Amino acid sequence: MATCKTRVLALSAAGLMLVLGACSKAESAKTPTDLDVTSASAGHYSLVWEHGGSEKVRVFAATDPKNPAAEGKEIGTVDGFSTEVDGLDPLSRWYFEVIDEDGNSTIASTRHVTLQGAANVRDVGGYETADGRSVKWGLVFRGDRLSDLTADDQQTIENAGIRTVVDFRGDSEIAKDGADKVPANVKVVNTAVLDAGTQALATAITSALKSGDPAIVEQVLGGGEAVRISDTGAVDQLSKPDGMAGYSQALRTIADSESAVAYHCTAGKDRTGLMTALLLGILGVPDKTIVDDFVLSNTYNKAKNEQTYTFLSSKGIDVDLLKPLMEQRPSQIQPVLDKIRDQFGGWEKFSQDVLKLDADTIAKLRSKLLTKQ
């Protein structure tokens, strides 16, 4: 196994600090692939790619995802397969491009968008399709409710280029939690997707939990009812025209928008998860990736969920009854993918027959959101 050493390069002109992981040439014989970007603190990023390029790679950073190498700043040259970047504007969204000496490159950013007032906002970009393309970064974002955004959060939203937000919440949810707090130049499109029956069920569950009475919660969610509700919720939506019309409107909004679009519900996991599955499916992203993205909400909602569990436990409520409704599982979204393929005839037919998207809109989505082959 090759050994690695660390060297520090200070770029005073750019106000940046790089920690460059240098490894032997044996580990850098392939083009840079699978660039993974994480951020442990504001303005600081860790970049890791599976293989270094032809001995060395150049690293670029930009706030526009289209072409960081041409439009951004050069961070430095790395002889290896990882680097740390510090000193970037914490309120901007940064995209990184790694280019080897043969000109092969890859672009990526953090999946998660760190905000103080929302926990589950994510970039939908970077996912690979079955035909070898990938979803472009920085054009579509998914999230939880945006009604608690701070001034800094709003600046981050603006800096990310988001100019349209689709809110899947119903009137009662907006009345309870508040309207989205977004910059003045962001258009909010209210598109409720839950039918009256589903909304009534959600209200009944909320009322049971608010009662603080373990017996009432057991009556509503016990006997496997919570699991049944959870596992059938998304797939049942496929047969509800009003809900599908709402998702269709969101897809048209994405296709027609000249800037980035974000969509969200309350927790950013069920309605938003279904919307993301529909979008990624139309784009040709494999089932496994769609499922992985769906359950990723568990990572970002974990802290809030734990607070809820602690509170309910203090009331004597069995939190295991609630977990199927609070946490995402493959069994919630895989039936959606199976039904679209097996009963609706695949994504093309489902998009046209159920979502009522014409061929031009489908083509526009793919042209706008996918890299070229």
Question: PLM features: residue spans?
Answer:
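Bacterial N-terminal signal peptides that target proteins for export
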Residues: 1-12
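Extracytoplasmic thiol/disulfide redox context detector
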Residues: 10, 17, 242
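Non-catalytic accessory regions used for complex assembly or targeting
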Residues: 12-14, 92
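C-terminal motif of bacterial Sec signal peptides marking the signal peptidase cleavage site
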Residues: 19-22
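Cys-dependent protein tyrosine phosphatase-like superfamily
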Residues: 24-261, 274-373
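Catalytic nucleophile loop of clan PA
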Residues: 264
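Ser/Thr-glycine-rich phosphate-binding loops at phosphate-binding pockets of nucleotides
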Residues: 267, 271-272
